[in-house]
Amino acid sequence: MESLTLQPISKIDGQINLPGSKSVSNRALLLAALASGTTKLTNLLDSDDIRHMLNALKALGVEYKLSADKTECEVTGLGRAFEPNEALELFLGNAGTAMRPLAAALCLGQGEFVLTGEPRMKERPIGHLVTALKAAGADVEYLENENYPPLKIKGTGLHGGTVEIDGSISSQFLTAFLMAAPLSTQETTIKIVGDLVSKPYIDITLDIMATFGVKIENQNYQTFVVPANQTYVAPGDFLVEGDASSASYFLAAAAIKGGEVKVTGIGKKSIQGDVQFADALAAMGTEIEWGDDYVIARKGELNAIDMDFNHIPDAAMTIATAALFAKGTTSIRNVYNWRVKETDRLAAMATELRKVGAVVEEGEDYITITPPASLQHASIDTYDDHRMAMCFSLVALSDTPVTINDPGCTSKTFPDYFDKLKELSC
């Protein structure tokens, strides 16, 4: 296995222009494919998850032109649901942002589809979405294990009506159903069961859907009413925001090491909830400056925090490694859905934090981290999880090197992450 050893980083300073958001990129690509008209997406993320979506759309008959650097994509929309002429098997890697929304969208039209992916994808639940789709008239079956991919889907259309979706495990189930619902033949009322996790990701979905011209009534995140027989309309140009989750590593680096880091591509007008990561850093003692399309972090004296991170679970991972540099014990709470991400992130994070010397308590939906007097050099296993690799790169901001196993796993969202980190540390 390839590994990368990062030597201690003595200073951090500079500016980072963020790659496009994974969450925004894949949502916008799917809606552009379903829309009438042509959409030109700029600042599209070039990563594994986006390639899986693009490959699936091409197989489904969608025409698009991708720039040489793969950050601009002109999509000619179908103006309708997918209706390929032949049965298709679509391999979606470990891309939840492709698997869940496509599973819903493929129910709308005609055709037979198998959706599959990497072994980890077959361990990531999808049952709550499938149950809701079946209630709206979909024909979906599990090919291996109940409630998990791979799926076999026969396009029958969705008839809407009142459906329930469990929101307690992943907001992607609701996102997927919301994006399909406007093309249903009858009005759809979606009732949320349990506490809805990651609400800011639903805000991203609703914002992009509105940009593509459809109407939804959001009743305090408990009920969503979606009128029937709507059509997505291409907005023309669509700028993909920078990835706010990816910003967290650079902002944290400034907070830990000093100097000043300016991150552009997100700001106080961002539609991504993960920009709130900067507020968590501020609570730890970092000086934060906000602009419309930038965030600046400057060194503070980092103190431990005890905080509910249900709203920003991805960015919360960065707090776990920043906690290694904070005074006191940090508690990250209400993050059960870490367990159903690219890996079981609670177990993985606890294991790897202990390797560098931290005292860690891992609960069902929380983790507490007490830093050691000095960090130990360790080889960090990344579990084919891009965020594990990027989070633990921050250990190099100490006086100790850190070895990252399988550093290439960052290709899921940020292929040149380690190059960007090096630019800030030169």
From Swiss-Prot:
Sorted alphabetically, the keyword list is: Amino-acid biosynthesis, Aromatic amino acid biosynthesis, Cytoplasm, Transferase
* Catalytic activities: 3-phosphoshikimate + phosphoenolpyruvate = 5-O-(1-carboxyvinyl)-3-phosphoshikimate + phosphate
Q: Which GO terms describe its molecular function?
A: 3-phosphoshikimate 1-carboxyvinyltransferase activity
Q: What GO cellular component entries does it have?
A: cytoplasm
| InterPro entries referenced in this protein's UniProt entry, alphabetically | Enolpyruvate_Tfrase_dom, Enolpyruvate_Tfrase_sf, EPSP_synthase, EPSP_synthase_CS, RNA3'P_cycl/enolpyr_Trfase_a/b
* Annotated pathway: Metabolic intermediate biosynthesis; chorismate biosynthesis; chorismate from D-erythrose 4-phosphate and phosphoenolpyruvate: step 6/7
Give the matching Pfam families: EPSP_synthase
Active-site residues (renumbered): D314
Chief site of localization: cytoplasm
Source domain of life is: Bacteria
Q: Any idea of its EC number? A: 2.5.1.19
Residues that coordinate or bind phosphoenolpyruvate: K22, G96, R124, Q172, R345, R387, K412
Compartments, record wording: Cytoplasm
Q: Give the family, as the similarity comment puts it.
A: Belongs to the EPSP synthase family.
Protein purpose: Catalyzes the transfer of the enolpyruvyl moiety of phosphoenolpyruvate (PEP) to the 5-hydroxyl of shikimate-3-phosphate (S3P) to produce enolpyruvyl shikimate-3-phosphate and inorganic phosphate.
Alphabetical list of HAMAP family matching this protein: EPSP_synth
Q: How does this chain assemble?
A: Monomer.
Q: What is this protein called?
A: 3-phosphoshikimate 1-carboxyvinyltransferase
Q: Which organism is it from?
A: Aliivibrio fischeri (strain MJ11) (Vibrio fischeri)
